Regions:
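Surface-exposed short loop/turn segments
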Residues: 108-173, 190-191, 195
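A structural "domain/chain start" motif
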Residues: 20-99, 216-219
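Bacterial N-terminal signal peptides that target proteins for export
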Residues: 1-8
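Extracytoplasmic/secreted envelope proteins and their assembly/folding machinery
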Residues: 95, 99, 103, 107-110, ...
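C-terminal/domain-edge helix-coil "capping" segments
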Residues: 20-49, 157-160, 170-177, 181-219
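A mature extracytoplasmic/lumenal domain signature
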Residues: 65-67, 131-135, 180-182
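Second-shell loop/turn segments in exported
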Residues: 85-99, 114-116, 191-199
Length: 219
């Protein structure tokens, strides 16, 4: 058995009932991130954190704009192992839309938890967010070029993967890394369209933001 260490605010509470066990830092150093150890039962797909860090001491966050330009894109109907570079183009408009959705989600979650979002104060936590993979189950870029409200049948709106890196803003020290992969949407074989897909993305970002903030504050 690995000796277990608890990590302040990041590990203090579980946000969703599905996450029944308390997240903990193990004595298992990351081979990818120097100084960070593996976190188990985090509520995310993967997580690493610096032992001894108390994220609940941070009363302010500074969320940098979400990046998505280099996200791996898997086309609808293609193998999950297939890497597609630009068949579904990640346009500046899509990038900005994703960034705007994330900014609204993390700001709302932080405000609700009583965290400042202007980056002021002595203890500021910087959050860098990057979309790493997008696998839509319908080509909404193509559908959006068709006049009117296009409808497609799809299992849901696809899936997406994201990475969060948490830094002490003053020192630049990396405190934690979180990676997560989620299905977008919840209805099996539902009618879906570009409007629904956008709503699913907003809901996904809200879920990510709320859970991340709960790990920071321990509330």
């Amino acid at each position: 058995m690995n000796k277990i260490k608890y990590l302040g605010g990041l590990m203090a509470m579980v946000f969703l009932a599905a996450c029944s066990s308390t997240p903990v830092i193990e004595d298992k150093p990351s081979s990818e991130f120097e100084g960070l150890n593996k976190v188990s039962s985090s509520g995310f797909s993967e997580a690493w954190a610096r032992p001894g860090t108390n994220l609940s001491m941070y009363g302010s966050i500074k969320a940098t704009p979400l990046k998505s330009a280099d996200a791996e894109i898997v086309q609808p109907g293609q193998s999950i192992q297939t890497r597609v570079q630009r068949d579904m183009e990640m346009t500046p408009e899509i990038e900005q839309g994703l960034a705007d959705n994330w900014d609204r989600a993390i700001t709302a979650a932080a405000d609700k938890a009583g965290l400042s979002t202007d980056g002021s104060g002595d203890k500021v936590l910087r959050i860098d967010s990057t979309m790493t993979r997008i696998a839509p189950s319908a080509n909404f870029a193509a559908e959006s070029s068709t006049p009117g409200r296009s409808t497609v049948y799809t299992e849901d709106s696809g899936e997406a993967s994201i990475e969060f890196k948490l830094y002490d803003d003053a020192s630049g020290e990396l405190l934690a890394v979180v990676r997560d992969k989620r299905r977008v949407g919840s209805q099996i074989w539902s009618r879906s369209n570009s409007v629904t897909a956008s709503a699913d993305v907003r809901n996904l970002y809200n879920t990510w933001a709320t859970r991340l903030v709960s790990r920071i504050t321990g509330q």
